[in-house]
Amino acid sequence: MIWDRVAPLYDVVVNTANRAVYAATGTAVARLIRPGDTVLECACGTGAIAAAIAPTCACVVATDYSEGMLKQARKKLARFPHVVVEQADITDLHYADDSFDAVVAGNVIHLLPEPGDALKEIKRVVRPGGTIIVPTYVIPKKRAHDVPEADLPIRRALPGAL
């Protein structure tokens, strides 16, 4: 899996190329989390968002499909005793319905062949009235609306999923 291979260098590359965006994403997500929330982060990668939200959460369950990314996340998140790092598939989450106050899925939806499957699972595990946060980087010179069909899978998925 590509993510297992890039995991050891992921933070170095991202922090070199996009340090401000990377930090701003974590800060923005943290503002949307209520103090004391129980949060599921899907596709946590190396744990940057989980690290940003952990100080205000009662519990964070940081998940990723890639064991390589999880290895990096475990190192980064070891200082937070209330953060659990687990392997999980965003399209087939093994958590009970209504388990979390908030679910975060950063920078992943656009990478999935069937984003609707992930969105349905996210909706299923967030409690009624909970928060769903799906931040995605936008590169100003390469906007999806410049390529009309670029976001079709996501647009098709939204009405049925949420």
Question: What are these model-derived regions, one by one?
Answer:
Residues M1-P35, A48-A52, M69-Q72, K76, T131-A161, ...:
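Conserved class I S-adenosyl-L-methionine
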Residues P35, V126-T131:
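Short glycine-dipeptide loop
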Residues A102-P115:
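A short SAM/SAH-binding and catalytic strip from SAM-dependent methyltransferases
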Residues T91-V103:
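A short acidic, Gly/Pro-enriched loop at the edge of an enzyme's catalytic core
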Residues G116-P128:
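A short glycine-rich, Lys/Arg-flanked "PGG" loop and its adjoining helix->strand segment in the class I
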Residues L40-D92:
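Class I SAM-dependent methyltransferase SAM/SAH-binding core
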